[in-house]
Amino acid sequence: MIVIPAIDLKNGHCVRLRQGRMDDETIFDADPVAVAGRWVEAGAERLHLVDLDGAVRGEPAHEQTIHAIARAYPDTPLQIGGGIRSRETALRYLEAGVGYVIVGTRAVREPAFVEELCREIPGRVCVGLDARGGYVATDGWEQTSEVAAVDLARRFEDAGVAALIFTDIGRDGMMQGCNVEATRELARAVSIPVIASGGVSSLEDVRSLAGSPEGIAGAIVGRAIYDGGLDLATAIRTAQEVGDDR
């Protein structure tokens, strides 16, 4: 399992939200490119970028910043979500050097879009399953659909999706621990690799996920590495050690 640091972008800054609320933010740094460099230096194998403003608007708001990070660290794959609701946006990101695009809102409203995108750019499309009470949220988490996260995941079983990024919104940014059981339940339901997100805040969370018999593919860490409660290099090393022992 790989540990993936998150960089959330809002108004040009690197921020963290609590439970996805746009009015409850903490600004951690005004230079997202420098933040990316810090995590790469700590050993990150991949970076998770979220365009928060883009997620709400439905179109990219931090495209140039993301392109700059891709140029600065070409050997570190980026996965980017937030506002990717068209083929053109996805292709622009890939052409700029982004490794993976994450489709969330449109995956809920139009699953066929994901299937078509997977055919055009196989192995480069992830689906963001941002769940509130088990149901997928959309539009920057401002709306909650009637689609169960597990049901949507099963829909993409044969589509060629690179990974499912599962976030328990209730845990996100709250430092209360990851919902390991819900993540494992999703991983049991499908053969698509599952990446955990939301609430990963301690080495115990990392150990629980990395040691899951279902084989969780990754864990995204956010607020804990910014607050100093979790050292990224130690988390990466711990995940590797647990994986070696499995």
Curated annotation (Swiss-Prot):
Q: Does the keyword Membrane apply?
A: no
Instruction: Name where it's found.
Output: Cytoplasm
Q: Which InterPro entries does its entry note?
A: Aldolase_TIM, His_biosynth, HisA_bact_arch, Isoase_HisA-like, Isoase_HisA-like_bact, RibuloseP-bd_barrel
Active site residues per record: D8 (proton acceptor), D130 (proton donor)
- Entry keyword set: Amino-acid biosynthesis, Cytoplasm, Histidine biosynthesis, Isomerase
Give the GO cellular component terms, alphabetically.
Answer: cytoplasm
Q: Identify the pathway.
A: Amino-acid biosynthesis; L-histidine biosynthesis; L-histidine from 5-phospho-alpha-D-ribose 1-diphosphate: step 4/9
Which Enzyme Commission number(s) are listed?
5.3.1.16
Which reaction is catalysed here? 1-(5-phospho-beta-D-ribosyl)-5-[(5-phospho-beta-D-ribosylamino)methylideneamino]imidazole-4-carboxamide = 5-[(5-phospho-1-deoxy-D-ribulos-1-ylimino)methylamino]-1-(5-phospho-beta-D-ribosyl)imidazole-4-carboxamide
Q: Does the keyword Transferase apply?
A: no
Entry-linked NCBIfam families = 1-(5-phosphoribosyl)-5-[(5-phosphoribosylamino)methylideneamino]imidazole-4-carboxamide isomerase (TIGR00007), PRK13585.1 (NF010112)
The protein's name is 1-(5-phosphoribosyl)-5-[(5-phosphoribosylamino)methylideneamino] imidazole-4-carboxamide isomerase
Q: What is the originating organism of this protein? A: Halorhodospira halophila (strain DSM 244 / SL1)
What gene is it encoded by?
hisA
